[in-house]
């Protein structure tokens, strides 16, 4: 049986955070696809092998929640984990209404992200 890669896509306009999440996920057995913008991800979405999308709520002038809604409208069912430094309850509510499987407030500990990935629905293989 061929080895099945477990790919997680991360979208964050902060390159330091993007790189840190890439290293964290790689250290825990995940392959990563790293995108610095909503448009960068959308350009690659048709070839993405991601089992989960981790997206920042605020992507510069773009909105990660709008990205998730756009993907859902197009029929994509990949689970989304939102992260943000915005601690307003209204942001968390909007993210959950957009279908988030998890919502992480920055700064968050690595275990919170890993636990969110481990709790993905069946069929979303975890290393």
Predicted features and spans:
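The feature encodes the CheY-like receiver
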Residues: 18, 60, 88
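Short amphipathic alpha-helix used as the core "switch/output" element in two-component signaling
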Residues: 43, 65-76
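C-terminal output helix
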Residues: 90, 108-118
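Acidic catalytic/metal-coordinating carboxylates
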Residues: 36-37, 63-66
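Active-site beta3 strand of CheY-like receiver
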Residues: 48-55, 59
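Alpha4 helix (beta4-alpha4-beta5 surface) of REC/receiver domains from two-component response regulators
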Residues: 66, 87-102
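Two-component/phosphorelay signaling modules centered on CheY-like receiver
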Residues: 15-33
